[in-house]
Amino acid sequence: MTDYTVHIVDDEEPVRKSLAFMLTMNGFAVKMHQSAEAFLAFAPDVRNGVLVTDLRMPDMSGVELLRNLGDLKINIPSIVITGHGDVPMAVEAMKAGAVDFIEKPFEDTVIIEAIERASEHLVAAEADVDDANDIRARLQTLSERERQVLSAVVAGLPNKSIAYDLDISPRTVEVHRANVMAKMKAKSLPHLVRMALAGGFGPS
């Protein structure tokens, strides 16, 4: 059993129980919460925990939950689960403090690896991995077009919208996006968004 607890926040009981069962079978200590409000009331007592929350919930969304945790100065590594293509909301969650986001549907290994990465924040700040000065230096290597594409990605725009706005083909957007990922040494889209925000680079 892990020495930290995974807190699952989802308003749908079958989803909550299914995820909890899978994680328990893989050696994680788990606690379930039926709503963002329920977890927020419990959060001050959390010690050594990782939060996995659904993004879209009634009454209080995952983004609002993260913002409330921030207002309360409660620092818990958080992962948000989003619907496919819900990148704009996921980006808002990253700005609110999430360390990762995962799109549905996902394989068990994807959420397990995300939780293990998030748990590393319990012992080491991410700044140790991606120094802000290094990130700004990488941003300086981007071409003007690459910076435009990155800005659109951080804004949560899909490739087709970026292509339309910049008057280029979707394939060209994919090429620029791949170049940005390589120059920024980003392991994934969430990692790229985190670095861009840490480097002070937001949507134009």
Swiss-Prot record:
This protein's name: Transcriptional regulatory protein FixJ
Main location: cytoplasm
Domain Response regulatory: 5-119
PTM statement from Swiss-Prot or TrEMBL: Phosphorylated by FixL.
Cofactor: Mg(2+)
One Pfam family, short name: GerE
Domain HTH luxR-type: 135-200
Residues modified to 4-aspartylphosphate: D54
GO molecular function, one term: DNA-binding transcription activator activity
